[in-house]
UniProtKB/Swiss-Prot annotation:
InterPro entries according to UniProt: Ccdc71/71L
Domain of life: Eukaryota
Lineage: Eukaryota, Metazoa, Chordata, Craniata, Vertebrata
Modified residues (Phosphoserine): 125
UniProt keyword terms in alphabetical order: Coiled coil, Phosphoprotein
Entry keyword annotation includes Cell inner membrane: no
UniProt name for this protein: Coiled-coil domain-containing protein 71
Pfam family name, one: CCDC71L
Composition skew (Basic residues), residue ranges: 216-230, 288-306
Disordered: region residues: 204-256, 284-310, 325-396
Coiled-coil residue spans: 260-330
Length: 433
């Protein structure tokens, strides 16, 4: 962006001037500078000057649209500019700046718009501008062709498109119509698309050159000399100046992206989207097939279970039938009466045999001496009667054998008398029986 050099002392205008974005951080800093709630205008002016100087040091060329160019009057003075001053501005350009060339935009082509440099900035920022090519609009594109016929205003504001917009708000609306372009080192594609859309929709359009349909090559100052910016039209070729560089460098730094490249990129994005949709559709069909197979497998498993149950039932029936046949073959050819008589005789024989065995055992036991018990089994204790009862307590005997030890006898007596008869006095309570 460029500043128009005026003989009057330069002042930073506290308004929403158009500053091309040099990135996200630069835009945020510009928004902080143009804070409408700030009360100290001198501080904001100093911040604005420092911000613009920082942009210049980084290699960018900021353009400040003065209030006279936007509104038709000066914000520093109350008196509007005279007609002679306006004519002097339009007729006599500054000596330090290069002559402005009108650029014609042919149908279906977009080109870079050149920016004139002021004399003060042409010395310090030419080396940095060789790296960062600017894509700012000319101030002449914002002015009408008939500046002499207009009374005080130089930009035709479309009031019918924006009803109810006051003059103080018109600058922001114009900036919305003209989308600010980014530098080509950041995003050339986005800048070309936004320029094409903004020039197609906005009522403010670039003037066309009179007479010659071919656009003149705009020139740009670099450290090596003048360099012509290429503008491609139907059948136009590359032009070279005195200090031109190679064709590849000119195409990379100066030529803008045409609509064919934009269309090719759009077609590529559409193709990618179609492929993505196709892949999604394939995955959906695969999932549907898997679900259908699972549904088909469930009835097959149920049929197999039913067949296994039928086979089991048949096997059980066969076993029952075989048992019934075996029972029938055993009782074939024998009357029922004979079976009952035989069974009765057998029962009688068994009963007589058991009686004889018992008698033999009793006779044998009489001749033998009685067997001694191996253990002294204590009898269960009687129920303890209270003091009110007059029934005497029955005596209990403890049978002692040679095999019984002293501890066993003591345990038996303890169970009967409920007294601890051990030689050692135990202080712990007795265990329940």
């Amino acid at each position: 962006m460029s500043m128009v050099v005026q003989p009057v002392e330069e002042k930073a205008v506290h308004s929403w001037s158009r500053i091309s974005t040099a990135g996200k951080k630069a835009l945020e800093e510009a928004l902080l500078v143009f804070n409408p709630m700030s009360q100290d205008l001198s501080a904001t002016e100093a911040q604005l000057v420092a911000f613009l100087q920082g942009l210049r040091d980084d290699g960018f060329q900021p353009t400040i649209l003065r209030s006279g160019d936007v509104y038709g009057y000066s914000s520093c003075t109350a008196s509007p500019p005279s007609q002679t001053k306006l004519q002097a501005r339009t007729i006599n350009p500054p000596a330090t700046s290069l002559p402005k060339t009108a650029v014609s935009v042919p149908a279906g082509r977009t080109t870079l718009l050149p920016v004139p440099l002021s004399g003060r900035l042409a010395k310090g920022s030419t080396a940095a501008l060789a790296k960062h090519a600017t894509t700012n609009l000319l101030l002449s594109s914002l002015k009408q062709s008939s500046a002499s016929n207009s009374s005080g205003t130089t930009v035709g504001f479309p009031a019918h498109l924006y009803p109810g917009v006051y003059p103080a708000m018109r600058l922001s609306v114009v900036l919305e119509a003209l989308v600010p372009l980014k530098t080509p080192c950041l995003d050339v594609k986005h800048g070309a698309q936004s320029l094409q859309l903004s020039l197609a929709k906005s009522p403010l359009k670039v003037r066309k050159a009179s007479g010659n349909p071919k656009s003149k090559a705009p020139r740009k100052i670099t450290s090596k000399g003048l360099k012509h910016l290429t503008s491609k039209g139907p059948g136009a070729g590359l032009r070279r100046g005195a200090g031109t560089q190679s064709n590849g460098a000119q195409r990379k730094g100066c030529s803008a992206l045409g609509p064919k490249t934009v269309q090719a990129q759009a077609s590529q994005t559409l193709i990618k989207a179609a492929r993505a949709h196709a892949s999604v559709a394939q995955t959906q069909t695969k999932t549907v097939r898997v679900r259908a197979k699972a549904k088909q497998a469930k009835p097959k498993a149920a049929r197999a279970k039913a067949k296994a149950a039928v086979v089991r039932d048949k096997a059980k029936d066969k076993v029952i039938q075989a048992k019934a046949k075996a029972a029938q073959t055993k009782h074939k050819g024998k009357p029922k009466g004979s079976v009952q008589t035989r069974t009765g005789r057998a029962n009688r024989k068994n009963s007589s045999e058991t009686v004889g065995r018992k008698r033999k055992k009793a006779e044998e036991t009489k001749g033998l001496p009685p067997k001694k018990r191996a253990r002294c089994v204590p009898r269960p204790p009687k129920v303890w009667l209270g003091p009110g009862t007059a029934k005497p307590r029955k005596s209990q005997t403890i049978k002692v054998d040679r095999k019984c030890s002293d501890d066993e006898v003591r345990q038996c007596a303890q169970q009967i008398l409920r007294v601890n008869l051990s030689p050692v006095v135990w202080l712990q309570p007795l265990l329940p029986f």
